Amino acid sequence: MASRDSLGEVFRVSIFGESHGPGVGALVTGVPPGLEVDEAYINRELERRRPGGPYASPRREADRVEILSGVFRGRTTGAPILLFIRNVDVKPGFYEEFRYKPRPGHADYVAYERYLGHQDYRGGGIFSGRRTAALVAAGAIAKLVLARYGVRVYAYVKSIGGVEARVEPRDSEEFRRAIDRDPLKCPDPEASERMRRLVEEARREGDSLGSVVEAVAFNVPPGLGDPPLGGVDALLARAVMAIPAAKAVEFGEGFALAFMRGSEAHDSPRAVGGRIVHETNRSGGIVGGLTNGMPIVFRVAFKPPSSIPKPRRTVDLRSLGEAWVSGKGRHDPVIGPRAAPVVEAVTAIVLADLLLLREALLPEWVEDLRPWTRGEAGGD
C-alpha cells in the first residue's frame, strides 16, 4: 500500500522537502539496473517545469538535480536512486503574516488544524507546488522505463480561462516540440495567443485563471491494470489529484458520457492486421480499470492560483477576529503551463510501475496459457 508521500508498488517514488526548506527530492526504488541516465537528462526535464518567464512565478530556482545514489558510471545500478534539488531563491519573510491569517484557497488553515500549528507555513510548506520538481525528476527515470516498452507520454495545456486548444495529439517529436516551445505549453498557436491575452489581463487586474491539462499515453499494451482498486484510471486519478491545485479529472469523454446514449457512448472493437483496435476512443483507453490498447487520454482541471494581490477576507486564528490578506510572495497567474510536465511525470510513474508489475506477475511464457493456444473452444 502506497503511503501518503509515495506512488507505486514495484517502481516506487517517495517525495520529501518543503517550499522554503533546504530542498526537495525523491527516492526512487525498483528501478531496473543498466538504464542510461545522467543529471543533464533529468535537468532537461526539470527545465520544462522551472519557474520564470512572463506567465509564471518570478521565483528563480536553478532546479539542478543531484543524483546521490543508485547511478554508477552513467547507468542505474538497481539500488534506490536518491534525487535532490536544492532550494536557492527562498524568501520566507513573505509568509510570516499567514502563520495565523490563512489565505483563502490555500491549505494554511487546514494544515494548522492537522499539524496543531507546527507545520512549516513558509511558501505553503509541503503543500507548495515546489515539491512537484521532485515528481518531475522521478518521472524522468520512469520515462526511461517506458522507453523500453515503447510507451510515450505527452501532456499539454488544453484550456485556460475558457479558451480551448483544438489539436489532435500525435505520437511524434514534432508534437512534443510544439508543446515545449510555447510559453503556455499549448501546441495550438491561435489558442495560445488568446490565452496569453487572458493571462496578461488577469495579472493586470491582480487576479488569476483556471486551466485544464490533457495527457495522452501512446502504445500502452492492452490488459494493463489490477482492478478494482488498482485500476489504471483509479491509480492515475490518485496520482494527478495529489498535484497541488488539481480539482477534477476525467478520462476519455468523461462527464460528456453522462449526456450520451449507450448506442453512441461505447467503443466498438475490430480486428486490424491481427490486432484488436477500437473504432472510437470515448473511454480514453481504459475500460473496467484495464487498458484496451488505445491511447490513454485524460484531462486534469486546475483551479486558479490562490495567491492573488486582491485583498480578501479571512480570520485571525489567535483572536478569531476578522482580518484581510493579499497575496504576497511570488506566484503563478495560471497553473496549467507548469503543471503539464508534472502531469506527464506522474503518468509516467504510474505506467512504469504497472508495466514492471505486469512483467513480474506475467512472464512471457504465460502467453502459452491462453485458451486458444491450447486448442480450447472457449464459452460455456
Curated annotation (Swiss-Prot):
Biological role: This reaction introduces a second double bond into the aromatic ring system.
UniProt KW Zinc keyword: no
Matches recorded under InterPro entries: Chorismate_synth, Chorismate_synth_AroC_sf, Chorismate_synthase_CS
Organism taxonomic ancestry: Archaea, Thermoproteota, Thermoprotei, Desulfurococcales, Desulfurococcaceae
Protein name: Chorismate synthase
Keywords: Amino-acid biosynthesis, Aromatic amino acid biosynthesis, FAD, Flavoprotein, FMN, Lyase, NADP
UniProt keyword Amino-acid biosynthesis present: yes
Database matches in Gene3D superfamilies: Chorismate synthase AroC (3.60.150.10)
